[in-house]
Amino acid sequence: LKYKSITYDPEPSTIGVKNGVSQLEFYDHFISEHKNSKKIEEYLIKSDIDFFLNNEQTAKEIDLTGLKGRLYPLANETDLIVFSPMMWGYNYIVSQNFIDSLNEVQVSDEDYTIYSVDIENAQNRNYYLLFIPIIPSNEVDYVNSILYKRLRSNASEKKYITISNFQEYNDLLDDYPFYDFTQLALPSTYKSKHILNIQNHVDLFLSDELIDSLQSKNVTNLVIKKHPKLVIQDHSL
């Protein structure tokens, strides 16, 4: 499979609001009213990434069905909705159109989990929180990845860097925290997955097949990015 990363469009012309980061809020009182409020707070909102990764299966199985949210005034309804507060593993609320594409390309049930949510002021009643397991940074194939230091300069001045392992990556970040990948590599264990969520990489990676399906349905608030390139090795590390 070949992949591209996706993001959302922060412009008011698409999401309706000017904050650029969120169309909807799961307000504190909505969370506190939910039957699993304590687990939501403990595992998804207030935890750090290490706690989450160590308890990811438990976090994934927290039933969020019926969690109430509210669109901000002027926010548009789109097929991908960005929301607050941040919850580990949940990048977007998605519409039935998005779910139909997951089914169309036969994305494995092991690769995602959905829970229907109640958006009080939405016209469309079929929205879902989409959980994608996070691939830990220590599973990235750093030998075949390429990084560059993020500078206030044009692309021609980028200095590309190759490293050998996860420890070298951590050492780089300790020295200078602003590195981006121009190529990101994963081991062969991930080669059949249509949707990937990698630690320290904000955007999801989708297979070209899944992207084609989403675009055929005119899914809104979906932005396809050219970089970084994702490669999955044919052999195990």
Show the residue positions of the predicted features.
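Short, compact, well-ordered microdomains
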Residues: 80, 84, 88-92, 96-112, ...
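Short linear motifs at secondary-structure transitions and domain/linker junctions
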Residues: 67-70, 86-91, 101-108, 170-173, ...
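Short N-terminal edge-element motif at the start of the domain
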Residues: 37-105
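Acidic, proline/glycine-rich low-complexity IDRs
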Residues: 123-237
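Short, flexible beta-strand-to-coil junctions
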Residues: 2, 7-13, 88, 135, ...
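Short, charge-rich amphipathic segments
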Residues: 21-39, 74-75, 139-152
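A structured, charge-rich N-terminal accessory region that forms the first stable segment of a protein
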Residues: 1-67
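Extracellular-facing segments of soluble proteins and assemblies that are Gly/Ser/Thr-biased and enriched
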Residues: 86-147
